[in-house]
């Protein structure tokens, strides 16, 4: 019992000393896109994401996986990385060959062109807990997953997949390799990435917001647009408000990536002409420290009025100066 206080202190320091990156969930996702136009032409491209950051890419035209971050190798040694990369190189060649054989076997039920997408990786939770996944889509429809120790079709998958799944599950070597990659290699690799990429993963970039409007498809209406850009991480809350009331007609578009790995989002609201008064766009983001951005539509109109006022004042001043000079010249001519 005398060691218990020291054990508790050690545990506390371990938790307290964890970085922010280790105290939130992160999804490590490998995305594979494979196209088969016919029996002699195919290509496979892959990208890898950790949270909102791309860490790797693998073009069909390249024999090796490219790093998109200085820390993309994580804590793996060069030898460990080469071994892992070789495993995927063998997989890519085998995958292409196996799909071509599968199409030959299933013809005429299934024929070219064929599109296959694969999403695999692991979800990392605080405390070193993790959960792996592997999903396969055929012609854009989710059809197969690897669950536990075996391949399974999902509800609604075509019945012709039963035979390939049976063959895959009979290959115990392949199933064991998939389990190892998902349950052991993935969490270990991601922990290294979280440590090596800590500064990038924990960065906070404040959003910039501005307002505009575009014509609406409805007569007598206009569409107000709230633009939000330059923020990281990706989660953000954008809403059109009238006072404290959220405007349920707010439509948020898709997140779009900027070249600097920040994000752009726009929120639109369709309103009747003349009903814009009192509306505001509110933006919440972790980088703002609770100080939300609030842009009032009425305030947007103020600069226009101010510019008109300044122009009118300048015209009056210029007119007065011209009149004064003209009077001076007239008076001078009268003296002469």
From Swiss-Prot:
Instruction: Give the signal peptide range.
Output: 1-21
Cellular component GO terms held in the UniProt record:
early endosome; endosome membrane; external side of plasma membrane; late endosome; lysosomal membrane; lysosome
Expression sites by tissue: Expressed on cortical thymocytes, on certain T-cell leukemias, and in various other tissues.
Q: Which residues lie on this side of the membrane: Extracellular?
A: 22-305
Stretches of the chain found on the membrane's Cytoplasmic side? 327-336
Localization per Swiss-Prot or TrEMBL: Cell membrane; Endosome membrane; Lysosome membrane
Name the predominant localization: membrane
UniProt KW keywords = Cell membrane, Disulfide bond, Endosome, Glycoprotein, Immunity, Immunoglobulin domain, Innate immunity, Lysosome, Membrane, Signal, Transmembrane, Transmembrane helix
GO BP annotations listed: antigen processing and presentation; antigen processing and presentation, exogenous lipid antigen via MHC class Ib; innate immune response; NK T cell differentiation; positive regulation of interleukin-2 production; positive regulation of interleukin-4 production; positive regulation of macrophage activation; positive regulation of NK T cell activation
Q: Which domain of life is it from?
A: Eukaryota
Query: Which is one Pfam family of this protein?
Result: C1-set
What membrane topology was assigned to this protein in its record? Answer: Single-pass type I membrane protein
The UniProt record lists the Ig-like domain at: 207-297
Q: Where is this motif: Internalization signal?
A: 332-335
The cysteines covalently paired via disulfide bonds are 122-186, 226-281
Please give the Gene Ontology molecular function terms for this protein.
endogenous lipid antigen binding; T cell receptor binding
Report residues carrying sugar chains.
25, 38, 60, 128, 183
Question: What Gene3D superfamilies is this protein classified in?
Answer: Immunoglobulins, MHC class I-like antigen recognition-like
Q: How is it modified after translation?
A: N-glycosylated.
Miscellaneous section: During protein synthesis and maturation, CD1 family members bind endogenous lipids that are replaced by lipid or glycolipid antigens when the proteins are internalized and pass through endosomes, before trafficking back to the cell surface.
**Protein function:** Antigen-presenting protein that binds self and non-self glycolipids and presents them to T-cell receptors on natural killer T-cells.
Its subunit composition reads: Heterodimer with B2M (beta-2-microglobulin). Interacts with MHC II and CD74.
Descriptive protein name = Antigen-presenting glycoprotein CD1d1
């Amino acid at each position: 019992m005398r060691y218990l206080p020291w054990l508790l202190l050690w545990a506390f320091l371990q938790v307290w000393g964890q970085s922010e990156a280790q105290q939130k969930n992160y999804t490590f996702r490998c995305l594979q896109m494979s196209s088969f136009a016919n029996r002699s032409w195919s290509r496979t491209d892959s990208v890898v994401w950790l949270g909102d950051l791309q860490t790797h890419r693998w073009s069909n035209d390249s024999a090796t996986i490219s790093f998109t971050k200085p820390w993309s190798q994580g804590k793996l040694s060069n030898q460990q990385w080469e071994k892992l990369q070789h495993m995927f190189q063998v997989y890519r060649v085998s995958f292409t060959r196996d799909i071509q054989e599968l199409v030959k076997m299933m013809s005429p039920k299934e024929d070219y062109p064929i599109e296959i997408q694969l999403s695999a990786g692991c979800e990392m939770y605080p405390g070193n807990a993790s959960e792996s996944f592997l999903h396969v889509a055929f012609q854009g429809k989710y059809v197969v997953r690897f669950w536990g120790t075996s391949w399974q079709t999902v509800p609604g998958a075509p019945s012709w997949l039963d035979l390939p799944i049976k063959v895959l599950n009979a290959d115990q070597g392949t199933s064991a390799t998939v389990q190892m990659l998902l349950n052991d290699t993935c969490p270990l690799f991601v922990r290294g990435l979280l440590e090596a990429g800590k500064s990038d993963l924990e960065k906070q970039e404040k959003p910039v917001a501005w307002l505009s409007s575009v014509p609406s498809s409805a007569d007598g209406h206009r569409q107000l647009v709230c633009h939000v850009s330059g923020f990281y991480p990706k989660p953000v809350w954008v809403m059109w408000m009238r006072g404290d009331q959220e405007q349920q007609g707010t439509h948020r578009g898709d997140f779009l990536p900027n070249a600097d790995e920040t994000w752009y989002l726009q929120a639109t609201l369709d309103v009747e002409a003349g009903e814009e008064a009192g509306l505001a766009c509110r933006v919440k983001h972790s980088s703002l420290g609770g100080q939300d951005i609030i842009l009032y539509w009425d305030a947007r109109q103020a600069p226009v009025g101010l510019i008109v006022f300044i122009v009118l004042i300048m015209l009056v001043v210029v007119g007065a100066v011209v009149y004064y000079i003209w009077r001076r010249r007239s008076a001078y001519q009268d003296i002469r």
